[in-house]
């Protein structure tokens, strides 16, 4: 398709046909082809085509800004690498009243050759819509060099405490990788009792590509698990609140009491 575009006469094409081609190029993030097409469309006198050209310009500008942002995140990680594999690790589920705490560790190929090697939209998982997270989670799992997910359930949280469990999931997700990284960077917390060099980054999921990737796959994994739990325990709205203490959730606790996946050590103010 890309080679054919350079042979097309856009002046003889209908607006619909041009738009279909442009939409296809946007979908696959083919910036080079879009720039080529737009150079032609800018000279077209049709109003609809001129409007399309303006939309292409805006798309290209947004993508160029996104490329700069992503390269900054990748380059942030490279500062720690020093020719060794770097793992980013993050947890999700520290604060909910129910369900597990989950961490993911991810090793990315930070040596991008061009913008197509970057993960468009990669950022702190909390700033993404659910569908965006799911799409990125699939891409990260497919293209990451290595990744691993580890969880501890509510019973372990009640027995050992959330602070210990938080450290344990960060540690075990890292140690469960198929290779041992030269350094692991973590979001907000240093990892105790791990025999790998560790740097913790405040707001790391906004600064580091590797930590952001870990935060996304950890959150998608946990959210999916809570959706499955909602089918077993339907009263609490787990499919919407992921176990966090929303009004709906706390009212259900008062009405129905806790279910087997609730963290009893978290419920003193609710039951």
From Swiss-Prot:
Keywords tagged on the record: Cytoplasm, Endonuclease, Hydrolase, Manganese, Metal-binding, Nuclease
InterPro entries: RNase_HII, RNase_HII/HIII, RNase_HII/HIII_dom, RNaseH-like_sf, RNaseH_sf
Gene Ontology cellular component terms for the protein in this record: cytoplasm; ribonuclease H2 complex
EC number(s) reported in the record: 3.1.26.4
GO molecular function list: manganese ion binding; RNA binding; RNA-DNA hybrid ribonuclease activity
Record-annotated RNase H type-2 domain positions: 84-271
Subcellular location: Cytoplasm
Catalytic function, reaction form: Endonucleolytic cleavage to 5'-phosphomonoester
Cofactor note: Manganese or magnesium. Binds 1 divalent metal ion per monomer in the absence of substrate. May bind a second metal ion after substrate binding.
UniProt enzyme class: hydrolase
Keyword Manganese: yes
One GO process term, biological-process aspect: mismatch repair
Cofactors: Mn(2+); Mg(2+)
Principal localisation: cytoplasm
Chain residues that bind a divalent metal cation: 90-91, 187
Role, per record: Endonuclease that specifically degrades the RNA of RNA-DNA hybrids.
Protein family (similarity comment): Belongs to the RNase HII family.
Protein name as annotated: Ribonuclease HII
Organism: Clostridium tetani (strain Massachusetts / E88)
